[in-house]
């Protein structure tokens, strides 16, 4: 069953290839959605796809790429959103 989740990632997550790395992992897990920088220095990640793959993506978000220092990941389920790819914005 396809579902959508939104993650708000706090910490040192901008300027460390967090969005690009998120895109690579999302593609690996067959997820669509997006990763975008927020003005407060955090990153927002929308993940759409099979729930077991989203769970894997969330585990990755809790660590991030090597240069990142993730402090917190707040995740909530959101209404299904149809996306055909994983975008960086």
Regions found by a protein language model. Name each.
Residues 1-89:
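Intrinsically disordered, low-complexity, mixed-charge
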């Amino acid at each position: 069953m396809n579902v959508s989740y939104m993650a708000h990632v706090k910490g040192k997550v901008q300027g460390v290839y967090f969005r690009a790395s998120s895109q690579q992992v999302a593609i690996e897990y067959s997820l669509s959605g997006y990763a975008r920088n927020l003005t407060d220095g955090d990153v927002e990640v929308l993940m759409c796809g099979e729930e077991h793959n989203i769970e894997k993506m969330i585990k990755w978000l809790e660590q991030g790429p090597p240069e990142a220092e993730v402090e917190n990941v707040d995740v909530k389920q959101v209404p299904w959103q149809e996306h055909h790819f994983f975008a960086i914005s």
